[in-house]
């Protein structure tokens, strides 16, 4: 299949620039895999589509304020570091802009010198390996000095950092939010629990590769970025219990989905596990664990719309997207959602 098979027309004004004041008041397109029926609802109506005994799987990763603005010690030139992957307590793989200002041995200061850094090596892809120097807890320093790295298609400044975090986020490590989860409120989660729906949490730290375009014509030639995931025994037991009792496993977002499908065996069972995944799901893939999917509306020609197409069918997915454009749904990270059942 070619990347152009996943293209669609999207007017720029439909790209949501800021979140809604009330998270669960966004729109929800409900798609029925068996009948092809399309319904238009509000996100909090999701509670009516889930049954007691179902298991909803959410990604509890938290977005790091991973964008740091530093000053080079010798020239005082400004430079931006984006933290991509932690190597150890002091060393990170980073994306640097402009790269020409960050050569091996160059040193940088952040804030009033609370944080210092030195470039120790440069990868083939141009990413810099940087060793930081600091006293105290790195995450606390990052909270003070760092900024949330918003996706490139969001042009407006985000006044409240927490609006780009899910209400259940706790495991810091992502470069981007698992955006399907942004629609849930504490109240909605409580309603689901009261109905007897089980909520299970896993972690997948979203990398910046999620925004990288597919640059090959043939999608099978695309090399997927790898991301760290972790699933506890408690979560695995809840998912397996739902499967064994004939209930549905509902993935909230593509990140939960990729984790579940990485861990799942041929019988749809999962186990406690952590590691790195570079799973690339596109049409032809047979889902093992995920029965239903909640996800936002994604970029044209992205690996995410390919994942959705593998779940719902390419033509069905593109039809749903065309309906969403016609009905003026809001797209991407701060946009509306779809529920495929």
Curated annotation (Swiss-Prot):
GO biological process annotation, one example: tRNA wobble guanine modification
Localization per Swiss-Prot or TrEMBL: Cytoplasm
UniProt-listed Enzyme Commission number(s): 2.4.99.17
A molecular-function term among this protein's GO annotations: S-adenosylmethionine:tRNA ribosyltransferase-isomerase activity
Class of this enzyme: transferase
The keyword Oxidoreductase is annotated on this UniProt entry: no
Reactions catalysed, as given in the entry: 7-aminomethyl-7-carbaguanosine(34) in tRNA + S-adenosyl-L-methionine = epoxyqueuosine(34) in tRNA + adenine + L-methionine + 2 H(+)
Keyword set, alphabetical order: Cytoplasm, Queuosine biosynthesis, S-adenosyl-L-methionine, Transferase
GO cellular component labels: cytoplasm
Pathway assigned to this chain's UniProt record: tRNA modification; tRNA-queuosine biosynthesis
Gene3D superfamilies: QueA-like
Matches recorded under Pfam families: Queuosine_synth
Family: Belongs to the QueA family.
Function: Transfers and isomerizes the ribose moiety from AdoMet to the 7-aminomethyl group of 7-deazaguanine (preQ1-tRNA) to give epoxyqueuosine (oQ-tRNA).
Subunit structure: Monomer.
Protein name: S-adenosylmethionine:tRNA ribosyltransferase-isomerase
